[in-house]
């Protein structure tokens, strides 16, 4: 299997026993020893088992290029590419609300760069938000070991600034001011739905 640049896909045994996804091809581990993806998956599993919410990670799309059929009943994929996801990382349902969000990590101490967010992802978030979905970015600053929920309604202002070539990133202070801090705890480690509760309350007031 190959990536879009033509380079072959190789398993990384140092990450999750050799498993690796395209959406987190540059997985960064925070001071607490787990990636944002792992923490989010553990939280989602806890929510599901506790009948709190049903939220899942969307599979990374793969484009199959070459298939060999050594036998009629068996197909062997000789060449395939990971495609750029057309939407966000996670979606689901929580207390009757549609939840849709992108999860990102950065090593930067002072800002979150916007160059790894794609136009079609923002367009998807915009469409979901216009349908009254609860849409946001979950951002972890690895070095600071801090996680924030940034609502789409706030993010779109920074995105417009980025597209207008005014500023290529969102500062930590801007995220702290416009987002919701998600503290670590015991179970689940990252209870981001508490921040979602605050977002739902705030947006219900803003949209009236």
Swiss-Prot record:
Site feature (Transition state stabilizer) residues: 104
Pfam annotation, one family: RecU
InterPro entries from the UniProt entry: Resolv_RecU, Restrct_endonuc-II-like, tRNA_endonuc-like_dom_sf
Record CDD domains: RecU-like (cd22354)
Alphabetized SUPFAM superfamilies for the sequence: Restriction endonuclease-like
Binding site for Mg(2+): 87, 89, 102, 121
Taxonomic superkingdom: Bacteria
Biological process (GO), any one: chromosome segregation
GO cellular component labels: cytoplasm
Reported cofactor(s): Mg(2+)
Keyword vocabulary terms for this entry: Cytoplasm, DNA damage, DNA recombination, DNA repair, Endonuclease, Hydrolase, Magnesium, Metal-binding, Nuclease
Role of this protein: Endonuclease that resolves Holliday junction intermediates in genetic recombination. Cleaves mobile four-strand junctions by introducing symmetrical nicks in paired strands. Promotes annealing of linear ssDNA with homologous dsDNA. Required for DNA repair, homologous recombination and chromosome segregation.
Protein family according to the UniProt entry: Belongs to the RecU family.
Full protein name: Holliday junction resolvase RecU
Organism of this sequence: Staphylococcus aureus
High-level lineage: Bacteria, Bacillati, Bacillota, Bacilli, Bacillales
Gene name as annotated: recU
């Amino acid at each position: 299997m190959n990536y879009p640049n033509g380079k072959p896909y190789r398993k990384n045994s140092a990450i999750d026993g050799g498993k690796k996804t395209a959406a987190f091809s540059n997985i960064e581990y925070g001071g607490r020893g787990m990636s944002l993806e792992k923490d989010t998956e553990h939280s989602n599993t806890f929510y599901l088992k506790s009948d709190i919410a049903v939220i899942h990670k969307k599979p990374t799309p793969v484009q199959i290029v070459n298939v060999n059929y050594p036998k009629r009943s068996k197909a062997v994929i000789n060449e395939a590419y990971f495609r750029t996801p057309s939407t966000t990382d996670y979606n689901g349902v929580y207390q009757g609300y549609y939840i849709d969000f992108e999860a990102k990590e950065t090593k930067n101490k002072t800002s979150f760069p916007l160059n790894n967010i794609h136009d079609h992802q923002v367009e998807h978030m915009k469409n979901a938000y216009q349908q009254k979905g609860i849409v946001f970015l979950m951002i972890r600053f690895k070095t600071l070991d801090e996680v924030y929920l940034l609502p789409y309604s706030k993010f779109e202002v920074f995105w417009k600034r980025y597209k207008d070539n005014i500023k290529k990133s969102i500062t930590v202070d801007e995220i702290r001011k416009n987002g919701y801090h998600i503290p670590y705890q015991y179970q689940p480690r990252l209870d981001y739905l508490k921040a979602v509760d605050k977002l739902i309350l705030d947006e219900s007031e803003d949209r009236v």
